């Protein structure tokens, strides 16, 4: 990474962050976007809204086929089998397609992607750690778009075995 100074550094590449980064670049700003994941899109795209909806959609199709719901439409099926590993691969394919699309938009709009965890060290100063683009960066403006993460209830630990978060479920 040769460039270390930008008009704007966006911290977080979820739906708010990546859209803001792309729009700022379209308006003529030099923009970097820091994301701790190796893929863009944030929680929603990687382990939240999108993959859960993909699995829900597949599950609804299975339920219609297995439960005879298609019979009302004149469609009769023999035995119906659920292939969970294949369903998960389908979900992964959808997520990969969308994250690749955001990558393409970053390149098309000349948004610099910085992989790692961001820390604001002062006015206009951002340090990126724990990633491929670790280093010090400067910007006229910093936009924080870090999104959310799962929280547990007091006294109830998310162990991802018996009590799972949305991330663990996917």
Model feature map: region roles:
Residues 2-14:
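Beta1/beta-strand and adjacent pyrophosphate-binding region of the FAD-binding site
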């Amino acid at each position: 990474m040769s460039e270390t100074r930008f008009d704007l550094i966006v911290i977080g590449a979820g739906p708010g962050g990546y859209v803001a980064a792309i729009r700022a670049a379209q308006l003529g700003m030099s923009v970097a976007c820091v994301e701790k994941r190796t893929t863009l899109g944030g929680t929603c795209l990687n382990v939240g809204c999108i993959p859960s909806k993909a699995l829900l959609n597949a599950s609804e199709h299975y339920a219609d086929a297995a439960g005879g719901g298609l019979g009302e439409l004149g469609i009769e099926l023999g035995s119906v089998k659920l292939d969970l590993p294949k369903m998960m691969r389908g979900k992964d394919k959808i997520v990969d397609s969308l994250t690749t699309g955001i990558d393409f938009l970053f390149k098309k709009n000349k948004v610099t992607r910085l992989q790692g965890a961001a820390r604001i060290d002062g006015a206009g100063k951002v340090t990126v750690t724990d990633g491929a683009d670790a280093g010090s960066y400067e910007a006229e403006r910093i936009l924080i778009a870090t999104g959310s993460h799962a929280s547990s209830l007091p006294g109830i630990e998310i162990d991802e075995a018996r009590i799972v978060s949305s991330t663990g479920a996917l």
